[in-house]
Amino acid sequence: MAFKKNNTKRIYNHGFNWLVAIFLLMFSSISYGQETSENLEHSTSLELSAEQEYNANKPILKDEFEWQFALDFSLVYDPIIIAGIEQDELLHYFMPGLLFDISYKGFFLQTNQRRSNALLGGTEFGYQLVVEQNWQLDVIAKAYMQGYDPAAEIEYSSGDEKLLAGLRERNVTLGIALRYSQYFENSLFTLDLAATTSGDDEFDKSVRGVIIDSFYSYLLPYRNWDIYFGAGLTYFSQDIVDYYIGVGSDEVNETRPEYTAKGGFRGQVEFYAQHPLSASWSFNAGITHSLYSSNVKASPLVDTNQVTQVMLGVLYVF
C-alpha cells in the first residue's frame, strides 16, 4: 500500500496521456490570437471568477472554458511504508511539478488545491453529472496509488538491494470513480467510490479492486493565510493491498517468505496552509500523517504502518 514516486526516475501515469490528447482536441479550435488588452481582460475575469468561487464555497458549474496553470517548486519529505526505500540525497527531496485546472462544458482536468498531497500527484479528469446548490456528483478518473520500481530504486536511488532485489515492479493504480461532494460554509466533504485497475500479478492477470476514499477539509482564513485542516479514511480491497505488499511465489528468498495480504484501511490527518507573496507567487506548507491498518506490518515488505509527509514550497501562478 505504498504511495511512492521514484524521485530520480519517476513512475509516470502513462494511462492519462490520452486524457491530455482529448483536451488538446477539444480546445484546438479555440483561437489564442487575441489582442494583448483582450488577454488581460480575460485573465482579470478568471481571477474574479476564482474569487467568487472561493467566497461562495459552493459547487460551480464548469460550463465556460477556463484555465489556470501553476509551477510548483517544493521540497518534500516523502517516506513510505515499504522497507528499503528512503530519501538519502538532497535531489530526492526536490519535487518540481506543473499544476493545472482546465474546464469546459462540464468536463474538467484539475488538481486538488485544498490538500498538500496535491503537490505529490493528484490530477483528476472528470465530468459533472449533477450540480446543485450545496452538493454535486461527478464521475472522475485519477491515480489513487503510486507504484514503485524496486530495480530502479536500487540502481538510481540507493535502495536497499538486500531487501528489494527480486521484487516485481508495482504499477500505478488507476481508478474510475463516482464522487459525491457536500459543501458547507467553510468546509467540504468528498466521497469517492472507485473501481480500480493496477498492473499484472505473478500470473500475468490484471489486478482489479475497489477503493472507497473519503475526506473532510475545513478552511480557516487567518489574516492573509488560507489554513486547511483535514481528515480522511480510505478503504482498499484485498486484491489491491496484496498487489502492493504481498509476496508472490516468484519473489520468495531466504529472508522473504511468500505472503498474501488482506484488505485494509488508511486514516489521515492533515494541515495545509497557503500565503500569497505577490500577485503571482504564493508560499505553501503542509504536513500529512497516514496510519494504515495494523495488519500491513505482517508483510515482509513493510517495516511500519504509519508515515508522516512534510512539504514546503512556492507556487508561481500564470
Residue ranges and their predicted role:
Residues 34-110:
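Short glycine/proline- and aromatic-enriched beta-strand/turn motifs that initiate or cap beta-hairpins
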Residues 73-75, 98-104, 125-127, 176-182, ...:
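Residues on the lipid-exposed face of transmembrane beta-strands in outer-membrane beta-barrel proteins
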Residues 88, 269-318:
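Predominantly the C-terminal beta-signal and adjacent terminal strand-loop region
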